[in-house]
Amino acid sequence: AALAASCTLSEPQRIEGLEWRAIGPRLCAGRIEAIAVAGDRVLVGAGSGNLWQSADRGTSWRPIFDHEAAFAVGAVAVAPSDPEVLWVGTGEVLMARSSYAGAGVFRSDDGGGSWRNVGLEDSYHIGRIVVHPHDPDTAWVAAIGHNYTQTEPRGVFRTRDGGATWQQVLYVSPRVGAVDVVMHPADPDTLYSVAWEHERRAWHNVDHGPGSGVYVSKDGGSHWRRLGGGLPTGELVGRVGLGIARSQPETMYAIVDSHERDA
């Protein structure tokens, strides 16, 4: 349509009767920021557009988030105790200049057939959602916060009533948000969260600082303490990625973005 509107053909009769068809790009899928799997169903959230669902392990796909207030998806989770309950955190988490903000957390109780916004609209960018293994109404959200402005609606939030109310259970500072939250596979009261000091400015990007680090809670998120014991600290620590080995749940791996080579 843009081509037809902007170009004048010297010999229009050459294309009379031809039908327009999409020819590409076909190999550019954009930014995939969230994946959740429940049986044969796979959910994929794109940073630049929509939540997609496959019911046949990825053979075919369809969008299921077209009519909501935000199109950038940063997190998606399926309730382990009820696979019809889906949670989506909007606002992508790459935090680039082109990163789109979201409109909070959305929930579906019918497998994605319908959605409702359940709050945290001012969190802007959500990095992770974890749902309690036995209670689909209890969830934790890692919110990064506004990309360009220091704000307080960031950190880890918890709901115990399906999103009707939220409690900010981990807050570090107006420039430090939470980009990840991980649950211990054998103990849902043990949670780990990644705090990330980040602020994008018009002329450059601050993506590291002393506020970045890993926190742990042993009581379902009510209280947190920062972990040390070998993890890098200081002005040059950036984003951290966490992973727990399910076959050996006392083993955790951390990938640290550090501007100090010896960290």
PLM regions: where:
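Beta-propeller blade termini and top-face loops
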Residues: 2-263
